[in-house]
Amino acid sequence: MLLSSLILHWIMLALQAQSQEAGLHAIFQTDQGQFTTELYFERAPRTVANFVSLAEGSRPWLDLEEGKIRQEPYYNGLGFHRIASGFVIQGGSPNGLGNDGPGYTFKDEFHPDLRHDSAGILSMANAGPNTNGSQFFITLAPTPFLDEVHSVFGRVVEGMEVIERLGNVPVVTHPLLGKTDTPITAPIIQSITLERQGELANQFNPLKISPALPRIEAIESRIFLTAQGDIRVAWDPLLGAKEYFYASTDMQNWSSIILPPQGEVSLMSLMQSYPIIMAKLIRATADP
């Protein structure tokens, strides 16, 4: 009888542990320690799909500085560029200024059960409605005024002491931006490892989410000379897309502009200043 009770108790504990571990988790390894987040892939599927595919390097993204389409782990080596004591820690900005991302944006995703109701909430940073990209933050306290403004997609389940440590990193006022939450030395995300437990988590494919997330792709273009002697570049524009023109004289340093929607621009003034240039066009499709 005692043996049966012990076996039953062990089975119940095992099932309880299994249910607690089931899900999709992101393990952050930083230079300040390790912490683990649970990702809400059932209630915020598109936001989680974006984060997971960037973290594991399965989704192409645009290196805005070099004008390269990359498909490699996005967050490795990036810092927490914002440390707002008692509020949030924020990361996911390649240039460390908080004004960039993966080259595309996607829409907000709100769920009535997902709220900024405690410390350790994982949520998307944005520059206004429907401007999500790669930047995220983790709360250091309840922040209910962020509900329905920022998309919650996870929470810290292990390592809150590391989050608290990150939240106490010394900061200074940024000399150019004037922000008072710039870390003297930004803590670094060394890697993010994704772990799946359970059937639903294993079935979740971030590349087969519906509606699909925006794509980064090269644009086919053609250069031609008009009867008036103007050198122009033309391409087939895609409605709603953000289309980039990158130019370089040495293949090392690139400058970029956002292309106009009409699908044709003059290169004359550029080529008068730089007779030999390399150019490439890249597109971020619109979020459906």
Positions of PLM-derived features:
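Cyclophilin-like peptidyl-prolyl cis-trans isomerases
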Residues: 15-246, 251-253, 259-278, 285-288
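Bacterial N-terminal signal peptides
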Residues: 1-14
